[in-house]
Amino acid sequence: MMDSQLHIASVLLDIEAVKLQPDKPFTWASGWKSPIYCDNRKTLSYPAARKTIQDEFARQIRDKYPDTEVIAGVATGAIALGVLVAQELNLPFIYVRSSAKKHGLGNQVEGAWTPGQKVVIIEDLVSTGGSSLAAAQALKEAGLDISGMMAIFTYGFTIARENFKKAEIELTTLSDYSTLIQQAANSDFISQEHVNILEEWRKAPSKWGVK
């Protein structure tokens, strides 16, 4: 585990972009009961956190994908993030809608690019990977060459790892679930009892809390 992952986890906890409530679970749109809720859009409201995340994305892209020609953000949560990263790297920016527009040009990918250009996709959060990989497919169909996808955070679900492996797309995240739980425990955000609950949830999230 890198120190940068712990630092990003600390940032997310400090601004409450990630909330941990093992005793008062959240209900996701999917219907799952969850002891964690992640809203990385909050990072945009805190200049120091925003700059930290922007700089870490840019640093890792320079290291991992030095030939990147375009940055793509996944709508809507990663559009602003993607713009920040593209500006830092002095690269063009495009974004991907969840579906093609029903009017006008009917675009799903917005912006200017040339087929064959190498693109890195920016996401705010990866859960199962379904919507993220749908965006990647749209970029492929638009003729772009996907170098990889980067996200602020992932829950680390097995299904997500399997989905990305099947799609043959490399996923890199600035922090992850295990790191965040460790940081939360180290910083006394949660007790060891809560750590155990959070670890159990991740093993079978769809069944957790079901009576």
Which sequence ranges carry the predicted segments?
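Phosphate/pyrophosphate-binding loops at sites that engage ATP/ADP/AMP, CoA/4′-phosphopantetheine
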Residues: F57-E69, L139-A142
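Short glycine-rich phosphate-binding loop at a beta-alpha junction
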Residues: P66-A75, M150
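Solvent-exposed alpha-helices and their adjacent loops that cap or buttress functional pockets
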Residues: K64, G111-P115, A142-G143, N163
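Active-site-facing substrate-recognition patch
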Residues: M1-K64
